[in-house]
Structure formats: structure tokens, C-alpha cells
Amino acid sequence: MTTIKKNVRELAVDVLESVEKNQSYSNLLLNSKIEKHNLSGVDNGLLTEITYGTIQRKMTLDYYLEPFVRDRKHTLSWVYNLLRISLYQMVYLDKVPDHAIIYEAVEIAKKRGHKGISSMVNGVLRNIQRQGVRPLTDIKDETERLAIATSHPQWLVERWIEQYGVEKTSEMCEINLTAPLQTVRVNTRKISRDELVRLLTEEGFAVEKSSIVPEAINCLRGNLVHSESYTLGFMTVQDESSMLVAHALGAVENDMVLDACAAPGGKTTHIAERLTTGQVSAIDLHDHKVKLIKKQAQRLGLRNIKTYVADSRDVQQKFSAEGFDRILIDAPCSGLGVMRRKPDIKYTKSKNDIIKLASIQTELLDAAAPLLKQGGRLVYSTCTVDQEENQRVAEAFLQRHPDFERDLELQERLPEGVQSFVEDNMLQIFPQDLDSDGFFISSFKKKSQ
């Protein structure tokens, strides 16, 4: 094994440690490690695979490790994470033989600990190599088995089964273990999709047109952020489900639009690209996040976005009543629809978090509603699949605001491939539906008096 690969595995342990101890986001930590250590494409891929894979399958790995680790409570966390990443490679990856994985783990243990730790790591992994892991069929309770087999907390599996049934829950849990495609949105102000596909192919990337969203391209090989076309502002990294929001909002030409929870700016810039003389007022609570919106707008060559640092629950203090043609509330949420991109989410969220978020979502909708013109459209969206944050928040909004009604034209504004998922004025996309992020969109019209 080369030194650089050894370092990759040590970095994976570092990331897992920070995720567990500091509640850090794995995706941000990974990007930081990759940049800091100037990893090659191969090592970048290996670090991402080991880190995400171990987090995604943490509960399964712990189930496998339990019979072999005598004193889990007194095992140092970095040692246990080293065992996790090693077992992940032994069970789920086949390019490196077990003896090499064990050797590498022991070397890391020697470097970071003492002889007793390296002996323990060697003993645990060699015992697993000889005996194999216990079968998941030993778990008799079906819900518990599904939870451990797919590494989703049992409370969450039970909640989804109650909301959607066993089959849909099982499908969702299974797909959450897979890696998502990188998808980009073409900046049609600058270039056509066909032309961008040609340029990216010439740069050596493997790409294909999305069959779901007309301005989307899927990346099959490479990272398009490193392309010249990205630097030139020809595209934005954005999931296909997220792109549906701008279609749902349907802002065109000279519309005045409020994006009340705008950072990091993917939907903001998408809306702005579809306008001519109109403008997007983009709000976010944090200054550093508003700077991200400005940075994206500048890269894309968009001058019709005005940014504000503010709490959108106080938005009535900043804007006049009935001043916007379109309002988007892409609300803060539990993020349960994007577990493939942020696998640590499933271990950090709780039932109480969902209750608190639903309350914030309600406040955001209530604050923005008076700012919409009569006949205008309000779109509420989240990247979660939980009914308490989605359908229930949307239904309750209508009950509190008799001056609003369901927007039954939502379906016809969306791309044909997703129209069948619309019910009334709501769209719920599950990760397994289109191999995209889980997403919810609902649309309301303000009645004309």
C-alpha cells in the first residue's frame, strides 16, 4: 500500500471523528480535506467512497462489529471509527484484499495509539476475516431488521411506514445507500444544452441530457465544478428535483420575485435566468450565505438579483404589502430527502427537530403571505419527505389564509416526466421515483378580490 492511500484512510477516520464529535457536515469536511491535502482524482474518490459509505452503513457495520468488540464503551472513538472504515472496505469493496486492509488498519493504529490498540484492531479484524459477519436475518423484528440493514434509525423507519407503508419505506431506505449523480443546470442565457454537452464532452467528461428537466445535464464521470464551462458560468450544480421549483413558481419576464430563504442561491439564480426585466429579492439569515448567492450570480452573469441579510419571519418590515408577483419559501427543513448527499443527517435529526422546523416553516409562510399581490403565486418547497413538514404545513396554511387557494395549474407548469406525481397543488418526489433528491413542492394562488 502506498503512503498516500494510507493517508486517505487516516483522513477518513478524521472526518468520521469530526462528524460524530462536532456534528460537522460530512460533505463540507470532505471538500475541505480534499482541498487541503491536494488529493488526486483517484484518492479523492477513495476518500469519498470510504467516508460516505461508512456513514451511510454505520448501523449495519456496528451490528457486524458488536460480537467482536468486547468493551465498546471503553473503546476510543477513533479506534472504533478505524474498525468501521476497515470493515466497510472488507464487506462492501472488492478492489483491495482483506489482508491489505487489515495491515493498513494496524499501521494506522500503531501510528495513532499504542501496541495494545494495534493488537486489538488486528485481533478484531482477523476474527471477522475468519468467522465472517453474522447474518441480518438473525434480527426477527422486520422493522428493526430494515432499520439496521439500511442504517436508518428505527424511529424514522417506523415513522415512514406509518406515513407511506412498508414497500415505499423499504425502497427509500435502500436507495439512500446509493451515490447520487452530479447534475447541473444549464445557464440558458449563455449557452444551449446541446452546446454545453458538446463542450463538456470535448473536455473529457462523460455527460448525458436529463430526461426529466429540459435544462439539466447528468454527469456520469468527473466533477463538472472543475470544468472550464463551470468557471465561465455556463452551468450551476443543482439536483433535478430542486430545479422543479423554478418551473413550479413560473416567474417570467418582468415579474418581481421574493426568494425568502435563498442561500446558497441555486433556485434564486434559476429564477433569475428565466426573467427578462424582472428582479429577484433574495433573503437569507446569514451574511456569509448571502455572499454565496452574490458569488454565484456574478459567475453566471446575472444582474437581476438583489440580496438582503435578514430573518424572513420579519420580512414585512422590509417590503411593502402586495409588492411581489411571485414568492418562494424554500424553507429550512430536516433534509430527509437528501440523505444520499448528506448521510449524517439520518443520525442527527429527531422527532423534536421536525416539530420545531414545522413551526418555523409555518411562521415563514405567514410572514410572506401579505407581500404577495392579488392573483400572485406562492410556492412552498422543502428537501424532505416528512408529511409533518410538507402536506400538513401546506394544508394548515390554507386553513389560516382564506385569501389563498390551491394552485391547480401547478401540474401543467412542470416537465412532463413529473406531472403524474402531482396531486392537487402538491408534488412529492421520493428519491426512488426519479433517482433524484426527495423533494416537496406546493403552490398557492392569492385570490383576487
Could you tell me what each predicted segment is?
Residues 1-449:
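S-adenosylmethionine
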